[in-house]
Amino acid sequence: MTASSLRTLRNILRELRRASPSTGPVREVFGYKFLLDEYRKTRNADEETVKTYQRDASYYLCLLKNERVKKELHEVYKGTGERPVEEVARMVGFKLPKTYDSS
């Protein structure tokens, strides 16, 4: 295994651990044994097969990261009903001008 494939494997396991409800060791994470077995199979594979596995693993890692980020964003911005204009403007980075009462 190359250094980049090991890095990808570690990152996948890290993302799976974050997504897992259990707080135990990484060996208890769903899919841990399967991933290690798949990575061990590629040890003796030809270069084209290894590239295919690495590409698929990086896609899977991207999927896991984006799912985690989506959940985090949903928690921050989940629907709370109608929001005031000032709050929505602040959320998207705008600053509304101050309004003065002319009376």
From Swiss-Prot:
InterPro entries: FMC1_homologue
Cellular component per GO, a single term: mitochondrion
Highest taxon in the source lineage: Eukaryota
PANTHER family named among the record's database cross-references: PROTEIN FMC1 HOMOLOG (PTHR31716:SF1)
Family named by the database record: Belongs to the FMC1 family.
Protein name: Protein FMC1 homolog
Organism from which the protein derives: Nematostella vectensis (Starlet sea anemone)
